[in-house]
Amino acid sequence: LKINESNNVTVKNVRTEWTGGALTTNGAYGIYPVQSTNILIDGVVAIGASDAGIYVGQSSQIIVRNSRAEYNVAGIEIENSTFADVYNNIATNNTGGILVFDLPNLPVQGGKNTRVFNNEINNNNTPNFAPEGNIVGTVPAGSGLMILANDNIEIFDNDFTDNDSANIMIVSYYITDRPFDDPDYDPFPESIFIHDNTFEGGGRNPDSDPLLALKSAMDAPIPDVVWDGTMMPGKQPSEIL
């Protein structure tokens, strides 16, 4: 269900599902508002998308609530968007449970001011089945929540359980190993506030060479919150987390 260039959008009690399992040939998106404002997604179920089950892109003033995303590559994705609240959702058995991304070379960028709270984010360990070349193809299986190059993000009161790579990852665009030539693009995450979440398990079987190396070096599971350590020159770590 794609909605483009619209205002005052409500998607309520809608189900999208590819019934053949996790296949690269499945459609990319279940629910897909883009370049829109004042969006409410409520009571939605999205299953089996080869990109994102619930995707909101290049939009502003967004609520995603009371919904369930499972067996997608990305369960719920907020991309190049501002002022999003994502709450009271279940993201389970996806490759990555919830993604908050900002990407280059798009008409709208500068993703910021998203809150993710009161969600259940568990067992997001499905092998990545995105078509070759898709940006979500870089997401490791076992990613609970991934923040990529987004600013002013608050993560609180969520339950994270048994996401095998890491429960929360904060990364720059450089982790994708993809070049970009957009002079206005900021590839670094900043001002990420994480508090009052619960964690159980996770980080025990990472699907990423850097995370595997970290796990081996520590001889312990990956910590619940992982930052890739990159930041804009002149910034301090206290300005990131």
Q: Whereabouts are the PLM-identified features?
A:
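Right-handed parallel beta-helix
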Residues: N7-G20, T37-S50, S60-A74, T82-G96, ...
